[in-house]
Design a protein with these regions (language model features):
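Catalytic toxin/effector domains delivered as secreted proteins or via bacterial secretion systems
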Residues: 2-125
Length: 125
């Protein structure tokens, strides 16, 4: 069994019982995920059992990245990048602490986050 309850088929199960599957690996540490139940909103797992993992999810129409989550060496989310507008910031990120989003905090992307977003947006081009 691999990261976040993943099995050989690439499935993951979060603590809230959302099921995910790996659609594509951009590199050995960056995975594009989809929820198996397409009726649900687009989300990413709260934890990863693979240290330093990066997960991304595309919009339902597949035209752009919606979310990117970066996890620490303990599998807890460090931050989540959103490409939707939030308080005039588009894109932006929300920091996480101890496995939970920091309440009401939103920031413009830092340079390393911008590079990561570009890498994921351009992976198939």
């Amino acid at each position: 069994m691999g990261g976040n309850g993943s099995f050989k088929r690439g499935e993951t199960l979060s603590a809230e019982n959302r099921k995910f599957e790996t659609v594509f690996m951009i590199d050995e540490n960056t995975a594009i995920l989809e929820q198996k139940d397409k009726r649900k909103g687009i989300k990413l797992p709260e934890e990863s059992h693979t240290p330093g993992r990066i997960y991304a999810a595309f919009r339902k129409d597949g035209k752009d990245v919606k979310l990117i989550a970066v996890y620490n060496e303990n599998g807890l989310k460090l931050y989540e990048i959103h490409t939707d507008d939030h308080r005039g910031l588009n894109p932006h990120y929300h920091p996480w602490k101890n496995g939970k989003p920091e309440e009401d905090k939103v920031y413009p992307l830092e340079m390393d986050m911008i590079k990561l977003l570009k890498k994921i947006r351009n992976f198939g081009k």
